[in-house]
Structures are given as C-alpha cells and as structure tokens.
C-alpha cells in the first residue's frame, strides 16, 4: 500500500470515528474537528456513504444559507464478533457496527485447558454468535480476538501465551479456515485500550494506559491517540517486568515478574500465604482456602474479612509500584484499571492511587487520573469490535 493510499485510509478511519463519537454531525463540523479541508472530508464521507458505513440523516440548523446535511454511522450495515480469549474463560459478543451488543456469552474453563478443547469451545461460541447475527447488507464483517500473549499481528500468530501454554499458534488461519470470515488478532490489553478509546467514557483522552488484570497482567498504551506497539509490536508486557530477584518462577520462565504479585492469581496466592501464617477469620480458613474465588474475596473484604482486606491491600501496593514505573516512563494523562480488577472495589482503588502517587517520581507534578474502567470486563471484547472496524478500513482487502 503506497503512502498516499495509506494516508487516505487513516483519514477515512478518522472521519468515521469522528462521526461515531459525535453520533450525528455535519461535514463542516467534521472538517473542523479532524483538521482536514472540506473537499477531503466530503470525498471521504461520500465513499463511506457509498460503501454503506455512513448514512445521511436529515438537516441541521443554519445560521444563514443552506442547512447542513447531517451524517450518522449506519449501525445496521453489518455485525461484528468480538472475543476476549482469557486464561480461564472466553467472553464473546456479537455487536452491530457501533458496538451495541446483540448477543453475549461468557464461558469458564480451567487454567491450562488443552488447546484442542479450548478451540472447540471457541468454535462453539462463534457458531452461536453467527446463528444470532441479524440479516444485514454486509453480513458479519469480521471476528476480532484478544489474546493474553505476544502476537504477530500481521499473520495473526500467537507467538507465546505463557498462561495458555501456547507457542506459535496460527490462530488467525485456524479461525479463518473454519468460518471463512476475516479474522483479526491482537494482544488483549491492546484490545482493551482500543475499547476504551472507541467506546469508553474517556475516549477523548489522548495519552492513557489501560491495565488489563486477570490471571496475568498486561498494558495497552495509547500515546497521542495511537496505540503504542514498539519496534516489533510487542510493547505493553508490564506483567513480565521484574520487581523481585528471589521470587518463584513465573509462567514465562523468568523470576520476579510483576504479575506474580499483582494479578488475580496473586490475590489468591496472598490469601493462602496469610492463612498459612495463621491470619484467619470467619470468612477464610484452611478448610475453604482452596475453594475461594476472587469475587468471593472482594465480597468478604466488603463484609469485614481481615484476611481478604490484607490481601487486597498487598496486591494493590505491588500493582501500584508497577504502575508508578509506567507513569514515570510514559507520563499518561490517565491510567484505567480494567478487566477483572475493575471489580476489585474501592479499598483496592484507594490503595492503588495512594501508592502510585507516592512512588511515581512525576505524579506529584500533574493531575494524573487513575480510574476503574466503566466498561468493566467488556473493554476487551469491545476493543475487538473496534479492531475489526479499524483494520477493515485500513486494509482494503478485508473491506
């Protein structure tokens, strides 16, 4: 793709995103917002209308002269499937073209599930979604999948996903051959960051870090409204930064990784450590410690469990140290805590904010915002919807 064609595709996506963000808008207003001349905006919107992605929707008010024609994204042009392929779950949604959910399912699975069994579950969920898809002009536009690991985006290959025990899995090819639909693969934290930018409350924030906290830990980094990928496309693996030189071996094979101290798995590990040390209460004991779940820990903490409160505070402190390092390096306007940690509660968030502000060298000099994702555990799946739209329009062979 030549530079001129690439620039045109980027501008086209920018125009579409602007229409999506504003719900209904005139060409003149788009031109002002995206800093493109009126003729360019007119040509790009005409293409989007011709392709069916945008529709004209009546007239706006005029201060004199002709009333402007208003534009709106055609939400019913096609459906999109978004998938968060977690370590112990698969979360799938079918949405229309503006991210409104048509069908949603969440399936649990055991950690370290056999790859073939996992793929069968994935196929079953995709087939369910396909059957639920309404009749639209373009049908199902594509499938976006977020995976916790190192992804070669161009080929859609999972190079390494330690918590899934996957290596060199050509996931895009596998799913594409099965369903004969365009498939787009990315790291799930990157997808979460895209979800926040496209569909979240803080979409207009130009520099942010989305922290995806589940069994593992990853970061999607947005700099100047663009996803920061690094030289090879692998940026954001904050869970595998070293904060301890004498810890147990991580799933990646290294020692002292942050996700060993700051994740769902870490929360469960701290609970067991505290009980072993003799710190018990009426909620947690040796008899039930192996059955405790993260959601039960959060609930018990709210009800006054000493063990659960201590565990949440310890994990928040370790995570705060890791995030403070990211803040020092990237100087974001906002840090968004997402995925499973979006349910960790106020006790966790207050401690996290306290530690980040104490530990970050630069946080004291500006108004850093640290918030829990309002999209909760939907940020990744919605980011996968955004991934399909943006990749589809940036690479015309999938349009």
Curated annotation (Swiss-Prot):
GO terms, biological process: D-xylose metabolic process
Superkingdom of origin organism: Bacteria
Instruction: Give the matching Pfam families.
Output: ROK
Q: Which UniProt keywords apply?
A: Carbohydrate metabolism, DNA-binding, Repressor, Transcription, Transcription regulation, Xylose metabolism
DNA-binding interval(s): 27-46
Alphabetically, the GO molecular function entries are: DNA binding
Q: Does the keyword Transferase apply?
A: no
Among InterPro entries, the record links this protein to: ATPase_NBD, ROK, ROK_cs, WH-like_DNA-bd_sf, WH_DNA-bd_sf
Give the family from UniProt.
Belongs to the ROK (NagC/XylR) family.
**Function, please?**
Transcriptional repressor of xylose-utilizing enzymes.
Q: What is this protein called?
A: Xylose repressor
According to its UniProt entry, this protein's organism is Caldicellulosiruptor bescii (strain ATCC BAA-1888 / DSM 6725 / KCTC 15123 / Z-1320) (Anaerocellum thermophilum)
């Amino acid at each position: 793709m030549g530079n001129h064609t690439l620039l045109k595709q980027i501008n086209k996506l920018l125009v579409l995103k602007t229409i999506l963000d504003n719900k209904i808008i005139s060409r003149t207003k788009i031109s002002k917002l995206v800093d493109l001349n009126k003729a360019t905006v007119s040509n790009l919107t005409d293409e989007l209308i011709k392709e069916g992605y945008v529709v004209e929707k009546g007239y706006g008010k005029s201060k004199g002269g002709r009333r402007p024609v208003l534009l709106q994204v055609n939400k019913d042009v096609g459906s999109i499937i978004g998938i968060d392929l977690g370590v112990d779950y698969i979360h799938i949604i079918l949405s229309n073209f503006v991210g409104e959910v048509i069908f949603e399912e969440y399936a649990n699975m055991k950690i370290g599930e056999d790859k073939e069994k996992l793929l069968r579950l994935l196929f079953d969920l995709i087939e369910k979604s396909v059957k639920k898809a309404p009749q639209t002009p373009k049908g199902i536009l594509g499938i976006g999948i977020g995976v916790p690991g190192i992804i070669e985006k161009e080929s859609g290959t999972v190079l390494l996903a330690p918590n899934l025990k996957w290596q060199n899995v050509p996931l895009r090819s596998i799913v594409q051959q099965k369903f004969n639909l365009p498939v787009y693969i990315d790291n799930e934290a990157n997808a979460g960051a895209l979800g926040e930018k496209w569909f979240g409350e803080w979409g207009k924030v130009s520099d942010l870090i989305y922290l995806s906290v589940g069994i593992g830990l990853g970061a999607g980094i947005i700099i100047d409204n663009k996803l920061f990928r690094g030289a090879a496309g692998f940026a954001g693996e904050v869970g595998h930064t070293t904060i301890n030189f004498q810890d147990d071996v991580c799933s990646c094979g290294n020692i002292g990784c942050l996700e060993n101290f700051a994740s769902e798995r870490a929360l469960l590990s701290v609970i067991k450590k505290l009980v072993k040390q003799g710190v018990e209460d009426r909620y947690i004991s040796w008899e039930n410690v192996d059955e405790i779940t993260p959601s039960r820990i959060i609930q018990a903490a709210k009800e006054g469990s000493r063990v659960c409160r201590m565990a949440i505070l310890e994990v928040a402190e370790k995570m705060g140290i890791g995030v403070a390092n990211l803040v020092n390096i990237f100087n974001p306007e906002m840090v968004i805590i997402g995925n499973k940690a979006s349910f960790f509660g106020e006790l966790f968030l207050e401690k996290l904010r306290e530690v980040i502000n104490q530990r970050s060298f630069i946080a004291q000099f500006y108004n850093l915002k640290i918030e829990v994702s309002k999209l909760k555990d939907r940020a990744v799946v919605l980011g996968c919807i955004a991934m399909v739209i943006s990749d589809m329009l940036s690479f015309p062979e999938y349009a």
